[in-house]
């Protein structure tokens, strides 16, 4: 299996209506999430606009939500599932009201390392409400820590960052996730064939990283 070049991923462009200011044109990158046959399951979106003086996680999340509400998921990713990096502030805000949840996965970050058990538990109500509305939630490997046990049943996806742990820990992480959740596992930041083979042999079905596809650009009006 060989990696997929950026040019191999079809680019999409959502044309701005006549009279639309270029300041409202968002440059969004999408990176494919694929199965073992390199069939695209979905795309993770990233803000790549340069108009703003600075980017923060919150501003990037707001821009992506606005682009989705304006253009719709199909214009940005076709009929595939879209994965969006969120902040906890954006999850509690009104950005999600105009987005149809069926094809949207919200990537929820862990709290700061200093977060208490009570602070982690306090997020459950918001996360559960999003699931009730039809959104699926994705967490990274932090959700497998004991302190996040209350989040684990809410996971639709767990993303295992191949750059964040040693190869010998892959097996225990995959086994623990399979025993304690119903989540679909995604190996992300897969950059070598060895990393892919390691996770595929452990039963992981979805993959993301430069070994498969680099991000490609999508233009959308916000």
Which role does the model predict for each range below?
Residues 13-20, 53-58, 76-80, 129-133:
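N-terminal start-of-chain detector that recognizes signal peptides
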Residues 49-66:
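A short, polar/charged loop-to-alpha-helix boundary motif
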Residues 21-26, 43-46, 63-65, 69-71:
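Short, surface-exposed loop/strand segments
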Residues 40-41, 102:
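A short, charged/proline- and glycine-enriched loop
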Residues 1-40, 48-52, 107-116, 140-144, ...:
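EAL-family c-di-GMP phosphodiesterase catalytic domain
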Residues 123-134, 171-181:
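Surface-exposed amphipathic alpha-helices with a cationic face
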Residues 100-101, 132, 152, 180:
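Short, well-ordered coil/turn elements that cap or connect secondary structure elements
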Residues 61-129, 135-140, 144-147:
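Catalytic core of bacterial c-di-GMP phosphodiesterases, primarily the EAL and HD-GYP domains
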């Amino acid at each position: 299996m060989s990696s997929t070049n950026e040019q191999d991923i079809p680019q999409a462009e959502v044309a701005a209506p006549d009279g639309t200011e270029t300041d409202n044109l968002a440059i969004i990158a999408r990176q494919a999430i694929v199965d073992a046959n390199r069939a695209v399951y979905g795309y993770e979106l990233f803000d790549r606009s340069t108009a703003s003086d600075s980017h923060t996680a919150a501003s990037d999340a707001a821009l992506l939500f606005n682009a989705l509400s304006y253009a719709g998921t199909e214009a940005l990713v076709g009929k595939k599932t879209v994965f969006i990096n969120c902040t906890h502030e954006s999850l509690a805000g009104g950005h999600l009201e105009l987005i149809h949840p069926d094809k949207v996965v919200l990537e929820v970050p862990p709290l700061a390392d200093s977060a208490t058990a009570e602070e982690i538990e306090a997020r459950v109500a918001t996360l559960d409400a999003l699931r009730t509305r039809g959104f699926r939630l994705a967490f990274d490997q932090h959700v497998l820590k004991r302190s996040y046990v209350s989040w684990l049943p809410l996971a639709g996806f767990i993303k295992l960052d191949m750059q964040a742990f040693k190869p010998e820990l892959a097996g225990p992480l995959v086994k623990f996730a399979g025993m304690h959740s119903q989540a679909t596992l995604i190996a992300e930041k897969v950059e070598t064939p060895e990393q892919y083979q390691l996770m595929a042999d452990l039963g992981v079905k979805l993959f993301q990283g430069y070994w498969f596809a680099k991000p490609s650009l999508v233009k959308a009006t916000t």
